[in-house]
Each structure stands twice: as C-alpha cells, then as structure tokens.
Amino acid sequence: MIRRSVVDSCIWAFGIAAALSGCVSIAPVTVAAPPGVRGVPTGMQYLYGSGEVAAISRQAYAALTTYVSGRSRMHWPVGGGPTVRMLPQSVVLASDATLAAPRFVDCVGKRPAIVLDVDETALLNTGYEYADAASGLPYDAARWERWERSDGRASGAVPGAVDALKAIRALGVTVIFNSNRTAVNARYTEAALTRAGLGPVRHGETLFLKGDAPGGSAKDPRRAIIAARYCVIAMVGDQLGDMTDLFNAGLTPAQRRSATAAPEVAGLWGNGWFLLTNPVYGTALAGDYDAVFPTDQRWVDPGTTKE
C-alpha cells in the first residue's frame, strides 16, 4: 500500500473546467462527479460496498490459488539428484533488472512462498475509511498511526483471501506479507491479520514492514530479503509498486500504463503478478486532464456547442 490521499467526490472533475474554458466552441459548463449516497465518496462505495469489487477480489484470489497449485506440483530442489525437475522461476526482479530488461532472482535451494501487500490487498481498512469519509478530513499520518495501533475490529479480510491463503498454505507454500505499515506497530498488525483469519504471521519471518530494511516506503529492499530466503512464485497487491518499485521510479501516468503492457512484463499479470482494485488511494490516482485523456480519444458533445 502507498497511501497518499482519499478520493473525494470531485476527483473525476479535476481539471475539466480549466480545460473547457479554453475551447471557444463549447459553452461554459459545470462538471461534477456523482456525490454518492449521504456524501460517501464514490471510490469508497465501489471498494468497500460494492458486489462488483467483492467479485473481482474473489476472482483474483481464485486465480492465484489455481496458479500456485500448479506451481507447487513441481519438485522443489534442496540439492542435486535425478529427481529434480525444472525450477519454477521467481517473480521477484533482481536488483539490476529493469522493466525493459527484466531478470529474476534464482530459486536454487529455496522453498516456495507468495508475497502479499496487506492494506486493501489482504485486509480492508473499512473502519479507517469510514472515519475519513465521515470527517471529510484529508489523510493525516497521526490518524493512520492511531489506526495501526487499534484492535483491528473495524477491519476485515478482502473477499476470497481467507480461503485462498488457507489453501495455499495447505500446499506447503509459505505466505508472507510485505506492508508499509510501520515495524514499531508490528504486534498490532500481526493481531489484525490473525483476527481477520489471514494468519498465522510473525514479524521478521512472514511479516515485513516499513523500517525492517533501508528505503522507507520502497518495498524492493524488503522483497530482496524475502527472495533471498524463498522462491517467491507469486506476488499480490493493489499498487504496481507491490510488484516492483521500478513502476514508481519517476514515470508519468502514461509511462506507467504503457509499462504494464510492455512485452517484457505483460505476461506476468495473472501469471505470477496479481493486482486487485483500489480506487480510493495510491499511486494510480495521478494525472491531469491531458495525462488521462489522450488527444486522439476525446469527444466533444455537439449538444454543448454554440450555434
């Protein structure tokens, strides 16, 4: 998770009025996004309240389980010998890799694991987002700190996650979490995950948090620690940075979008890299009017043009 701001009810209108003011053939209009019900931001309605996202999440976790099951049928080598079959390839990029030239950490002598983000990937922060929506206040680091240290009763598992992780553990695959929650609050995060049915977890073994490695919110240093111990056959998140920090390396929204479709990495989606929906916060919520709408894909409603 990378938390920046909560989507408010006007995010889809950002920059539109300014762009329209320069079009002399278009009458001035006021654009407003649907306000939601009783002021609930539409992104929160979608993520925390809709059946659509619940179905998407279950679909993603079902696909993850099927994928991991197929991988786990291979022989996991702990030494040489004639019974060793083809090594399953790690999906963690090596330290010298790029998106244009990806190279992956090797799996020799390592047992299988999957790595998941926590917030809005495995655990829904419904209670925290309720407080944000009800107060109308912007994101506040101190409030998030208080939430991390809460008892976790107002959070719950992402639909499909509990059954998937239970099935994956039964296959002999270790489940590891890599989160930007802080290491000083590790025991609270352990408790929240366990309460939601996503455990067992143990900080430093199957739970890695901000502060466990250099780099602050960057997850690659923690991924490197995990990949040194395990053959990471799948990763799950709600942000591109849950797969590699290279997606956050100064790329524009258009460049990030293009990077996901590049031949070198496109085949990983649903095949080692699994991404869930998050329209509420994160690196996806970026881009002005020009960045979001390509010039060759714009329509001017003739009903708004002047006679």
Predicted regions and their residues:
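Sec-exported extracytoplasmic/periplasmic mature domains
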Residues: 69, 73, 128, 166-174, ...
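Bacterial N-terminal signal peptides
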Residues: 10-22
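Short, acidic loop-to-helix structural element flanking the phosphoryl-transfer center
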Residues: 148-176, 183-184
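C-terminal cap/substrate-recognition subdomain and adjoining C-terminal extension
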Residues: 26-31, 62, 186-307
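A solvent-exposed, charged loop/short amphipathic helix patch at secondary-structure junctions
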Residues: 130-152, 254-257
